[in-house]
Amino acid sequence: MEQYEKVEKIGEGTYGVVYKARDRVTNETIALKKIRLEQEDEGVPSTAIREISLLKEMQHRNIVRLQDVVHSEKRLYLVFEYLDLDLKKHMDSSPEFVKDPRQVKMFLYQILCGIAYCHSHRVLHRDLKPQNLLIDRRTNSLKLADFGLARAFGIPVRTFTHEVVTLWYRAPEILLGSRHYSTPVDVWSVGCIFAEMVNRRPLFPGDSEIDELFKIFRILGTPNEETWPGVTALPDFKSTFPKWPPKDLATVVPNLDAAGLNLLSSMLCLDPSKRITARIAVEHEYFKDIKFVP
């Protein structure tokens, strides 16, 4: 750890404290994440070390780069490139950005490119939200943070500072107790973030798992065996759920054009097997008027 000098604490993430720090060798500013492990006495699980080592191989312009992993005294420190702005802060501080449909489109495109890359390497995020989408102010490019950490460390119900981990972007199959979820969970989260960028407020701001599910069902309709084969067999599905009809998404996200609504509805498909993939989403006609120059 001698190589890194902590400058200041910049936040508290899902897994532990995040510091702004300086690399004494290169003089570069970096973000240092201290991972707090549940079983402090047992040190760092070897599975976590293996998972994290794989993430160092991930290199893409829309992924926050994991530069180093430091394992010292039963603690794990992850060294990331430093970016001080996230999408939540950006939406809160400059609402005018959201009035620009091109900016929303550019951000969404970059999120999907980053996700498609991760999914092609069989890495899931599982906890995507505006707070872990980081923005480089100089280039306006967007990068995904914390990819792969859920698999290495699990997702706690509360953070180490007892904040509740948000449910607003969590896919219905996870909320219904499915143990066999996969890449579609991330596409769902991106759909929620897309709608939030356009509407300037969260789409499904539930405060408990059942409230979250019902907020989803009120808009997209309560699923049944016709619309989502197998749904009634999921562990937390109840036949007593109220049966809401689906709403027209155009009334829910009124500022989105037809192509955008088509893309959004294919991302917010309740049945994960029918949800669009990130790889196919980047080719959608909604993006036809942007030529992204790397």
Swiss-Prot record:
Gene Ontology terms, MF aspect: ATP binding; cyclin binding; cyclin-dependent protein serine/threonine kinase activity; protein serine kinase activity; RNA polymerase II CTD heptapeptide repeat kinase activity
**UniProt GO BP:** cell division; G1/S transition of mitotic cell cycle; regulation of G2/M transition of mitotic cell cycle; regulation of meiotic cell cycle; signal transduction
The organism sits in which domain of life? Answer: Eukaryota
Name positions with the PTM Phosphotyrosine.
15
Catalytic reaction(s) noted: L-seryl-[protein] + ATP = O-phospho-L-seryl-[protein] + ADP + H(+); L-threonyl-[protein] + ATP = O-phospho-L-threonyl-[protein] + ADP + H(+); [DNA-directed RNA polymerase] + ATP = phospho-[DNA-directed RNA polymerase] + ADP + H(+)
A matching Pfam family: Pkinase
A GO CC term assigned to this protein in UniProt: nucleus
SUPFAM superfamilies, sorted: Protein kinase-like (PK-like)
Q: Which UniProt keywords apply?
A: ATP-binding, Cell cycle, Cell division, Kinase, Mitosis, Nucleotide-binding, Phosphoprotein, Serine/threonine-protein kinase, Transferase
What EC number(s) are associated with this protein in UniProt?
Answer: 2.7.11.22, 2.7.11.23
Record: active site:
127 (proton acceptor)
Query: Could you tell me what this protein does?
Result: Plays a key role in the control of the eukaryotic cell cycle. Component of the kinase complex that phosphorylates the repetitive C-terminus of RNA polymerase II.
Family to which the UniProt record says this protein belongs = Belongs to the protein kinase superfamily. CMGC Ser/Thr protein kinase family. CDC2/CDKX subfamily.
Spell out the protein name for this chain.
Cell division control protein 2 homolog
